[in-house]
Curated annotation (Swiss-Prot):
Protein name, UniProt field: Multifunctional CCA protein
Catalytic activity: a tRNA precursor + 2 CTP + ATP = a tRNA with a 3' CCA end + 3 diphosphate; a tRNA with a 3' CCA end + 2 CTP + ATP = a tRNA with a 3' CCACCA end + 3 diphosphate
Residues the record lists as binding CTP: G8, R11, R91, R137, R140
InterPro entries: CCA_bact, HD/PDEase_dom, HD_domain, NT_sf, PolA_pol_head_dom, PolyA_RNA-bd, tRNA_CCA-adding_enzyme
Species per Swiss-Prot/TrEMBL record: Shewanella sp. (strain MR-4)
NCBIfam families, sorted: PRK10885.1 (NF008137)
Length: 416
């Protein structure tokens, strides 16, 4: 019985990155032997055990055989006869197929160390193409290690392109697809994840709403990058540089989906694209089982980002309506999220990457002033029922008007 540290822990150690989780592989043992040693079995599809003291996972060495469609269509075979190399052969990338024994020696039958040094993401074997989830995993690794200079090996990209043309991707469950998206949104370069998927053809299959943005032009005056898909990737990158909130990053990703619905004869203009995108966002979120928190913010950003950009031109009454619609009174953190997404939208354009966004300070000041209206004092003054709401609303409009009057660059005009 031999125990090896495998997978991400070995890879990250070689990259001098923090090690989060440790996974172990056991060669030459039976489930009965593991149980006798005090390990607790938790794996249903294949033998995985928890260490009696550390609770870390120990999996028996196994092989896999493709028996059906999708990432779950595998038959696993675990036996004391399965060798270290046979187990490593079933793994996705060479950089994830390195093992370390208890003496600290590295076992690298598929040259993963050389690929780490060459910064290459390369598949271990042709069996890579049997698991469609690996297309998403490689895209995620490309995004995760983009800052370290990693690139996908040409032969691996060719395999991913072939896989994207088969029915395998459509066999992925929405939950597994979203799981990979969510992990990527939490990484340093989520835009790379989607760029890789587009490069291999998977974006069109899994995220047709996003893929449809590429090739849609925008006015060059405001968008020197012109292409809406390119702009979307730039906005996602900007949002990632400003916040780690995945909900904000998701909102940045989908804020312009409505532009794909603009009639070609109207290009490069996209009137009402924010509102046109709302049903598209709802449909995407429903299909992928996107959390409500992400969906609600994405809908708000799509619906209101044009108003936020034009904040200085809005009447005080319109600003209060925006605050009401977004329910900032009960969820003030949403204003910060909306503004972050709008800043990313403004800076996600060629030549505008470091542009100031005074609308943010202005709307924050408007909200702070409006939120200071004392509702309890209005109730104490004897107002009742619908009167309370009317008076509160009127007072809030007055407070915003005062901010507007003294704010440089804000138009004082209050008539429609």
């Amino acid at each position: 019985m031999k125990i090896y540290l495998v997978g991400g822990a070995v890879r990250d150690s070689l990259l001098n990155l923090p090690i989060k989780d440790k996974d172990f592989m056991v060669v030459g043992a039976t489930p009965e032997q593991m149980l006798q040693l005090g390990y607790r079995q938790v794996g249903k599809d294949f033998p995985v055990f928890l260490h009696p003291k550390t609770q870390q996972e120990y999996a028996l060495a196994r092989t896999e055989r493709k028996v059906g469609l999708g990432y779950g269509g595998f038959s696993c075979y675990a036996s004391p006869e399965v060798t270290l190399e046979q187990d490593l052969l079933r793994r996705d990338l060479t950089i994830n197929a390195i093992a370390q024994d208890e003496a600290g020696n590295l076992h690298d039958p598929f040259h993963g160390i050389a690929d780490i040094e060459a910064r290459q993401l390369r598949h271990v074997s042709a069996a890579f193409s049997e698991d469609p989830l690996r297309v998403l995993r490689v895209a995620r690794f490309a995004a995760r290690f983009h800052g370290l200079g990693f690139e996908i090996a040409p032969e691996t990209m060719a395999l991913m392109q072939h896989m994207s043309q088969t029915e395998e991707l459509t066999a992925l469950t929405p939950e597994r697809v979203w799981q990979e998206v969510d992990k990527s949104l939490g990484g340093p370069h989520p835009e790379v994840f989607f760029e890789v998927l587009r490069q291999c053809g998977a974006l069109k299959v899994l995220f047709p709403e996003i893929d449809a943005l590429f090739g849609v032009p925008q006015p060059e005056k405001w968008h020197p990058e012109i292409d809406t898909g390119l702009h979307t990737m730039m906005v996602l990158a900007q949002s990632s540089s400003m916040t780690e909130e995945k909900a904000v990053r998701f909102a940045a990703l989908v804020h312009d989906l409505g532009k794909a619905l603009s009639p070609k004869e109207h290009w490069p203009k996209h009137h009402g694209h924010g509102q046109k995108g709302l049903p598209v966002i709802k449909s995407l979120c429903e299909r992928l089982r996107v959390p409500n928190e992400y969906r609600d913010l994405a809908l708000l950003v799509s619906d209101q980002h044009q108003n936020v950009h034009q904040a200085f031109e809005l009447r005080s009454e319109t600003i209060i309506k925006l605050f009401d619609k977004a329910d900032f009174w009960r969820k003030p953190e949403r204003l910060k999220q909306l503004l972050l997404a709008c800043i990313a939208d403004m800076r996600g354009r060629t030549g505008f990457e470091h542009q100031p966004y005074p609308q943010s300070d202005y709307l924050n000041a408007c909200f702070l002033a409006a939120n200071n209206v004392d509702v309890k004092a209005i109730i104490a003054a004897g107002f009742q029922g619908a009167q309370i709401k009317e008076v509160v609303n009127s007072k809030r409009i007055e407070m915003v008007a005062q901010v507007k009057q003294h704010w440089p660059g804000a138009q004082a005009k209050e008539t429609p």
